[in-house]
């Protein structure tokens, strides 16, 4: 009995050595490994292959090409399943969406000596800590980076706009951060653009928008007290919150966006909204700013289909519905009607509206978060409304940058109050045209209808002057009310 066991063990040893020799020969002849590490990996893979064949898990075909292709397809399926789990994870989607949004902004901007895009990696949490540590907002690192290092430095290049890849809700910390950022943006005359999350409206996603009858009533609730208070602040006019999300890319797949390394089919069939890659609409608004600046030198032509607010070339994805029809996924997450667009704008948001059946959308308004104050006179109400529109804030901010830069250069010169006033008025009139029939391009180059600068001496401070600039922009069409009357004879037109 003992002799039989010894003979069996010896036979197994000889068999293993023979098998090992054969395996080594396969690896050598097939040139399957370059070093010892690859050699061990190759042995493991061949061993697994043989094991699956012996156990019946893998059926070999007499046609070798069919067998190999079948095996490759199975590997692609397994890898695709793993890739889908990774790519549809919330954290990964957020990261990919941020990078693709930044890529979209830079790709669609003509950067150069006159237009630069600077990127700073910072989270909402880090920014909030920065402001909380500072006694005042002007002692924060954010203020020093945005204001002091550029606008407040001789030879610095002031920022024209700040774009934050964040989403703000109604959380107290979000409101505190928005307030602090608005103070920095107002001091530096650099409007801050970001996004409003669906949570701002009390929704889990923007798909719940259709269930709400009146958006304004949402913000009448007690929990929105901080938001209402923020809208009343002067600095909130330097904040613009875009919404909803924008589709960043088509799903990967042979029929949509093929991959080169392996046959990857992304598990997106149009039914699960969360599996699409959505990004921040502030990047889309950013491209409107950079295009307007490249064309006219101002960020005024940024709204409307014909006025610079058109966002073209959005990713589109079609899918088959349960009824067998072909539908297109809205590239702006949800369709927004004209009435709903006005509701969002009236409540301090900048909606991106998709044009049905196309691959483009448009920003029809650039309403800041600020709520226009109500006065007794029409003129005062008109001024208050103008000060809430970002296209005018951008123009005024650019004048503020130049005024400070020019007058810094005049320090130490023998300039009287009258000379200073004359100099500033001559300068600002270079951007004025009183031609109301001028083309949109001309009005974009000359954004002011009227302008005047008054300079006065500061009592008790010889050589110190205070300048106040009065600017009237070219008004842009906001809305047109249409009235229809069916009559037998046409009446004479009204005079004027």
Please provide the spans of the model-predicted regions.
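N-terminal-proximal low-complexity accessory segments that begin disordered
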Residues: 2-125, 132
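Short, glycine/acidic-rich hinge or "gate" loops at secondary-structure transitions
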Residues: 90-97, 115, 202-203, 438-445
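Short, hydrophobic/π-rich interface segment
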Residues: 419-444
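Long, charge-patterned amphipathic interaction tracts in eukaryotic proteins
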Residues: 97-170
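C-terminal edge-of-domain segments
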Residues: 452-496
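Long, contiguous, structured domain-core segments that constitute the functional module of a protein
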Residues: 263-422, 479-482
């Amino acid at each position: 009995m003992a002799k039989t066991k010894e003979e069996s063990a010896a036979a197994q040893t000889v068999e293993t050595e023979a098998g090992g020799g054969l395996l080594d020969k396969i690896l050598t002849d097939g040139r399957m490994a370059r070093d010892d590490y690859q050699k061990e990996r190759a042995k493991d893979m061949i061993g697994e292959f043989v094991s699956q064949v012996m156990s019946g898990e893998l059926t070999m075909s007499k046609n070798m090409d069919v067998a190999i292709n079948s095996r490759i397809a199975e590997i692609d399926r397994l890898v695709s399943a793993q890739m889908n789990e990774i790519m549809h994870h919330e954290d990964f989607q957020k990261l990919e969406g941020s990078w693709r949004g930044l890529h979209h902004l830079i790709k669609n901007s003509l950067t150069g000596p006159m237009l630069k895009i600077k990127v700073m990696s910072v989270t909402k949490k880090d920014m909030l800590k920065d402001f909380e540590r500072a006694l005042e907002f002007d002692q924060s690192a954010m203020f020093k980076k945005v204001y002091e290092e550029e606008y407040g430095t001789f030879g610095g290049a002031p920022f024209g706009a700040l774009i934050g890849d964040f989403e703000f809700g109604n959380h107290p910390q979000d409101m505190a951060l928005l307030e602090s950022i608005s103070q920095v943006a107002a001091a530096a005359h650099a409007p801050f653009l970001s996004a409003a999350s669906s949570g701002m409206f009390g929704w889990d996603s923007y798909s719940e928008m259709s269930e709400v009858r009146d958006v304004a009533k949402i913000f009448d609730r007690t929990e929105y007290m901080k938001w209402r208070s923020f809208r009343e602040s002067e600095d909130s006019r330097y904040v613009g919150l875009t919404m909803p999300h924008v589709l960043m890319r088509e799903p990967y797949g042979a029929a949509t966006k093929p991959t080169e390394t392996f046959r990857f089919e992304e598990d997106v069939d149009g039914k699960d909204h969360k599996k699409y890659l959505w990004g921040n609409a502030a990047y889309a608004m950013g491209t409107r700013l950079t295009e307007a600046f490249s064309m006219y030198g101002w960020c005024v032509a940024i709204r409307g289909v014909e006025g610079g607010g058109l966002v073209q070339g959005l990713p589109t994805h079609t899918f088959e519905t349960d009824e067998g029809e072909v539908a297109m996924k809205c590239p702006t997450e949800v369709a927004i009607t004209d009435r709903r667009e006005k509701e969002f704008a009236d409540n301090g948001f900048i909606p991106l509206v998709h044009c049905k059946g196309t691959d483009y959308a448009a920003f029809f308004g650039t309403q800041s978060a600020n709520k226009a104050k109500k006065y007794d006179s029409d003129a005062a109400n008109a001024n208050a409304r103008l000060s809430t529109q970002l296209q005018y804030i951008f123009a005024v901010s650019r004048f503020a940058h130049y005024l400070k830069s020019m007058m810094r250069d005049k320090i130490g010169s023998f300039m009287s109050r009258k000379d200073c006033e004359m100099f500033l008025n001559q300068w600002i009139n270079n951007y004025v045209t009183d031609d109301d029939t001028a083309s949109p391009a001309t009005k974009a180059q000359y954004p002011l209808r009227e302008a005047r600068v008054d300079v006065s001496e500061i009592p008790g401070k010889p050589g110190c002057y205070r300048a106040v600039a009065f600017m009237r922009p070219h008004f842009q069409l906001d809305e047109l009310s249409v009235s229809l009357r069916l009559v037998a004879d046409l009446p004479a037109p009204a005079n004027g």
